[in-house]
Amino acid sequence: MEIKCHRVSGGCAEGPALVTRERISFLGNVDPETGVVVDPAHELYGRSIAGVVLIFPGGKGSTVGSYVIYQLRKRGMAPAAMINLKSEPIVAVGAIISDIPLVDRVPEWILDVKDGTRVVVDARREVVVLPDGSVKV
């Protein structure tokens, strides 16, 4: 199934989905050395964001979060791609300077995709590709 989206940062990537309904502050929620979510109050606590298609409503917090995303990329610990309901400047800048595909303006039911589902983010074509039957719409 192809879902139309809006390109924030170009490129194409695929990987297993990692989904949260909570916003992410890259400064404080994520260890920039390992890519592991270190905030015990976050639902992704203890999970790695490295190599996944990270699906979350959007970012929050300090502008330093953009640089944390860049650090993650330099260390090979960044998400393969990111999908937001609505991107904000911190995540957008982080994705752009790190060359990570980022799209937004997707249906809210994208947050119902199961972790591990293979997702393709083709920001060039402004589509997200999900396997048929991966989510009930």
From Swiss-Prot:
EC number: 4.2.1.182
Protein purpose: Component of a hydro-lyase that catalyzes the dehydration of mevalonate 5-phosphate (MVA5P) to form trans-anhydromevalonate 5-phosphate (tAHMP). Involved in the archaeal mevalonate (MVA) pathway, which provides fundamental precursors for isoprenoid biosynthesis, such as isopentenyl diphosphate (IPP) and dimethylallyl diphosphate (DMAPP).
Main enzyme class: lyase
Keyword tags: Isoprene biosynthesis, Lyase
Disulphide bond pairs: none
Keyword field contains Oxidoreductase: no
Database matches in SUPFAM superfamilies: LeuD/IlvD-like (SSF52016)
Lyase recorded as keyword: yes
Positions annotated as active site in the UniProt record: 62
Reactions mediated catalytically: (R)-5-phosphomevalonate = (2E)-3-methyl-5-phosphooxypent-2-enoate + H2O
UniProt organism field: Methanothrix thermoacetophila (strain DSM 6194 / JCM 14653 / NBRC 101360 / PT)
Pathway(s) this gene product operates in, as recorded in its UniProt entry: Isoprenoid biosynthesis; isopentenyl diphosphate biosynthesis via mevalonate pathway
Family matches, as InterPro entries: PMDh-S-like, PMDh-S-like_dom, PMDh_S
Family designation: Belongs to the AcnX type II small subunit family.
Subunit comment: Heterodimer composed of a large subunit (PMDh-L) and a small subunit (PMDh-S).
A GO MF term: hydro-lyase activity
Protein's UniProt name: Phosphomevalonate dehydratase small subunit
Any Gene Ontology biological process: isopentenyl diphosphate biosynthetic process, mevalonate pathway
Coiled-coil regions listed: none
